[in-house]
C-alpha cells in the first residue's frame, strides 16, 4: 500500500465508518431476550449443574469408594472416606463436595465407573453463607433421590454420544 493510499484511509477514517456501518446494521435487527425467572430456555442434556449421588433401584447407593473422582478433581473439591463392610465391599462413610472450590468440569462424572456421581441440570441454587455450598453425602443422596427421573432422562438422551 502506498503512502498516499494510507494517508487517505487515515484521513477519511474508513475503519471508523466500517465499524459504524456494522453497528447500524445490527441496531435495527430483532432482539432475542428471555425474561429469565418467568421464561426459560431449553437446557442441554450435557449441562453441568448441581452434583448428586445416585442409588440403584434396590435403594443401595452406587458409590463403591474407588476415589477416582477425588483423584481426578483438578480443584480438590471432593473429599471421600471409606470403610470395608462385613461382606468385604467398600462403601463411603464420608463424601463431601465443596461447591465454592468446584469448577464444574465434569471430570468426576466421567471418571465414575458406576455412574454414582452426576451433575444435574439444576442451575438455581444458592447459599447465604459459605457453609451452605458444602454438600455432604446425605445432601447429595437427597438431591439424587429427588431428581432421579430427570437424571435418568438426561443420561438416556446423551447415551448415544458417549
Curated annotation (Swiss-Prot):
It is found in: Cell inner membrane. Its EC number is 7.1.1.-. One of its GO terms (biological process) is aerobic respiration. It catalyses: a quinone + NADH + 5 H(+)(in) = a quinol + NAD(+) + 4 H(+)(out). Binds 2 [4Fe-4S] clusters per subunit. [4Fe-4S] cluster 2 binds at residues 73, 102, 105, 108. GO terms for cellular component: plasma membrane. It is a peripheral membrane protein. [4Fe-4S] cluster 1 binds at residues 63, 66, 69, 112. GO terms for molecular function: 4 iron, 4 sulfur cluster binding; iron ion binding; NADH:ubiquinone reductase (non-electrogenic) activity; quinone binding. Pfam families: Fer4_7 (PF12838). InterPro entries: 4Fe4S_Fe-S-bd, 4Fe4S_Fe_S_CS, NADH_quinone_OxRdtase_chainI. Its cofactor is [4Fe-4S] cluster. Residues 54-83, 93-122 form the 4Fe-4S ferredoxin-type domain. Its main location: membrane. Keywords: 4Fe-4S, Cell inner membrane, Cell membrane, Iron, Iron-sulfur, Membrane, Metal-binding, NAD, Quinone, Repeat, Translocase, Ubiquinone. NDH-1 is composed of 14 different subunits. Subunits NuoA, H, J, K, L, M, N constitute the membrane sector of the complex. Belongs to the complex I 23 kDa subunit family. NDH-1 shuttles electrons from NADH, via FMN and iron-sulfur (Fe-S) centers, to quinones in the respiratory chain. The immediate electron acceptor for the enzyme in this species is believed to be ubiquinone. Couples the redox reaction to proton translocation (for every two electrons transferred, four hydrogen ions are translocated across the cytoplasmic membrane), and thus conserves the redox energy in a proton gradient. This is NADH-quinone oxidoreductase subunit I. The lineage of its organism: Bacteria, Pseudomonadati, Pseudomonadota, Betaproteobacteria, Burkholderiales. The gene is nuoI.
